[in-house]
């Protein structure tokens, strides 16, 4: 099972410099969006693709797990609120007519947030290598040092919008390469973050077994 049972799953978009230089200005604040807690699945559970979407991709993300209530926090307060870290897969479906890919129809489908089953504590996350591999082919290869906002700053940003409670998760974004990480039924996606661990899930069509 996932290492926590969040009531809120918040996530940052455009928080990696190698991605932002292609789509936005590097001085823009990262975007914050939500994923439904109902879309969490454990390692090795299938990612189920909807029949209506022809383009679905995976995104490796370092996930922060909250250990104490936090709201409108400073960076120092946010840092103290972090219980630990795990790995997450921010699965995304291309939206209708190519519209905003951070809406519920893209981000919150059933099974669209695999989360690791191990919570890591007491580690330095400043420069961790993170990769995505699909059927043995590497599609993402980045490092947490390239984030615009680090752990504490990410939690502080989200806390200015909404309260975070123990067990909640903040996904801190994904590096470049997501558009090369398209998945289809029969594929296997394996994500890995140095010092955190691996997260592997098979891909099936929704409605199949």
Where are these regions (language model features)?
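Extended, compositionally biased flexible segments
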Residues: 1-58, 198-201
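Catalytic-pocket segment enriched in acidic/His residues
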Residues: 2, 19, 25, 94-209
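Short catalytic-site patches enriched in acidic/histidine residues
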Residues: 31-48, 70, 111-116, 171, ...
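Hydrophobic beta-sheet segments that form the core/acyl-binding groove
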Residues: 45-52, 66-70, 132, 186-193
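Short helix-to-loop capping/linker segments positioned immediately adjacent to catalytic or ligand/cofactor-binding
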Residues: 51-54, 70-75, 117-122
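Ligand-binding beta-strand-loop-alpha-helix segment within the catalytic cores
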Residues: 60-62
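N-terminal accessory regions of nucleic-acid-interacting proteins
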Residues: 71-85
């Amino acid at each position: 099972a996932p290492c926590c049972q969040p009531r809120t799953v918040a996530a940052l978009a455009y928080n990696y410099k190698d991605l932002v230089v292609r789509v936005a200005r590097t001085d823009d604040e990262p975007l914050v969006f939500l994923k439904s807690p109902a879309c969490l699945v454990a390692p090795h559970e299938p990612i189920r693709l909807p029949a209506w979407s022809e383009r679905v991709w995976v995104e490796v993300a370092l996930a922060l797990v909250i250990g104490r209530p936090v709201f409108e926090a400073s960076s120092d307060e946010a840092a103290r609120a972090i219980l630990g870290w795990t790995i997450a897969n921010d699965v995304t479906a291309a939206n209708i007519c190519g519209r905003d890919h951070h809406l519920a129809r893209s981000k919150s489908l059933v099974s669209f947030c695999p989360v690791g089953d191990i919570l890591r504590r007491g580690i330095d996350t400043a420069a961790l290598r993170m990769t995505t591999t699909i059927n043995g082919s590497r599609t993402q290869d980045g490092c947490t040092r390239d984030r615009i906002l680090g752990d504490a700053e990410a939690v502080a940003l989200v806390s200015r919008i909404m309260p975070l409670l123990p067990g909640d998760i903040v996904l801190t974004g994904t590096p470049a390469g997501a558009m090369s990480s398209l998945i289809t039924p029969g594929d296997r996606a394996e994500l890995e973050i140095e010092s955190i661990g691996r997260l592997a899930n098979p891909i099936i069509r929704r409605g199949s077994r």
